[in-house]
């Protein structure tokens, strides 16, 4: 018997805040098994390497606290290398995360004419069967990541240019620029679902994302705040082992305690690595919940605003199912 037996709520529809939250929790409740399975297979290896980079970064920092080295260039090069590796791995994991979450959402919301789900039991889908769907989403994920990078680079350059023109860097200027930047973040979050759920170009998608974002600014802030609060509490609790190992190492190094030899031992390094791995993996799982909530906010915005008369229908996700299947058969 199928895992999903009820009629699924349409993806593209107007939603109140309670509807956005309930649709998010309904999706997670119905699909937590395939979601965790796909995320674990795709992202855990990246997390394993990222945990090494993160541990190397903290070890270098605490090692420099314990030594009196004057090799500033060597220290900066080491920090830059490990920090850069951590960021690149984070970007790769984000691409996998976006592709997996939104491919699964399309499969979940693909419906027949009578409203029944096309895919009745996603729990039985193997990673090999799921891979073509995630691969089809990778291009959209790349667009959203590049758009985010462009957004941050442009804003940083604007801030630098404004400060240079005003020839002032007082607290008032910083507060105004900071408030302006924060106000732009909710619309920027709509970049991810716009590229993922619509066949749009790079600049057209960016324009549409910011129109959706500004017109539904309050809704984005409300749903992301609540979902982020819940996920941050869970992630914060599960990150305690890593935080404790990092704090213990920092304390023993700064105090130059006899326990410094213990924090450099194999056992402590293994515990520190595993706790960092758990911390990073849990954070990505938490981010998936935020992506789901933003997607339902996007579905609401499409129905409420109907920009460019785009034909938003859940049966379009059935084409995604068929196209990915045909692609896999080549």
Spans of model-derived segments:
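Helix-boundary and loop/linker segments of multi-pass membrane transporters
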Residues: 26-30, 72-77, 131-135, 166-167, ...
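N-terminal low-complexity, Pro/Thr/Ser-rich intrinsically disordered segments
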Residues: 119-121
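Proteins with a high burden of low-complexity, intrinsically disordered sequence enriched in S/T/G/P/A and R
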Residues: 161, 169, 209, 308-313
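Non-cleavable N-terminal signal-anchor transmembrane helices
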Residues: 1-79
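Short helical patches
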Residues: 1-8, 21, 138, 165, ...
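Juxtamembrane transition segments at transmembrane-helix termini in multipass membrane proteins
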Residues: 2-7, 11-12, 60, 65-73, ...
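Interfacial aromatic "cap" segments that immediately flank transmembrane helices
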Residues: 13-46, 124-154, 186-234
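Hydrophobic alpha-helical transmembrane segments in multi-pass membrane proteins
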Residues: 38-59, 82-98, 142-185, 223-250, ...
């Amino acid at each position: 018997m199928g895992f999903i037996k009820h009629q699924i709520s349409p993806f593209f529809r107007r939603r109140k805040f309670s509807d956005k939250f309930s649709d998010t929790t309904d999706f997670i409740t119905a699909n937590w098994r395939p979601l965790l399975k796909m995320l674990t297979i795709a992202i855990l290896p990246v997390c394993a390497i990222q945990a090494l980079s993160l541990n190397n970064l903290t070890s270098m920092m605490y090692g420099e606290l314990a030594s009196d080295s004057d090799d500033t260039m060597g220290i900066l090069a080491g920090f830059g290398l490990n920090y850069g590796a951590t960021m690149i791995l984070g970007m790769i994991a984000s691409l996998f995360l976006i592709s997996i979450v939104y491919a699964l959402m399309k499969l979940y919301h693909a419906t027949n004419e009578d409203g029944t789900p096309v895919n009745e039991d996603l729990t039985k889908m193997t990673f090999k069967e799921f891979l073509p769907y995630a691969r089809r989403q990778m291009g959209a994920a790349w667009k959203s990541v590049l758009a985010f990078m462009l957004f941050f680079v442009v804003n940083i350059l604007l801030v630098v240019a404004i400060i240079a023109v005003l020839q002032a860097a007082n607290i008032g200027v910083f507060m105004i620029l900071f408030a302006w930047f924060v106000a732009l973040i909710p619309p920027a979050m709509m970049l991810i679902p716009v590229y993922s759920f619509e066949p749009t170009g790079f600049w057209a998608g960016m324009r549409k994302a910011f129109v959706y974002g500004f017109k539904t600014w309050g809704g984005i802030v409300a749903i992301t705040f609540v979902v982020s609060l819940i996920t941050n509490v869970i992630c914060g609790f599960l990150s305690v082992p890593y935080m404790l190992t990092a704090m213990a190492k920092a304390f023993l190094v700064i105090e130059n305690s006899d326990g410094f030899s213990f924090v450099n031992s194999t056992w402590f390094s293994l515990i520190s690595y595993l706790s960092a791995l758990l911390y990073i993996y849990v954070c990505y799982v938490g981010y998936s919940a935020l992506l789901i909530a933003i997607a339902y906010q996007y579905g609401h915005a499409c129905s409420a605003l109907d920009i460019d008369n785009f034909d938003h229908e859940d049966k379009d996700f059935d084409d995604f199912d068929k196209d990915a299947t045909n692609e896999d058969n080549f």
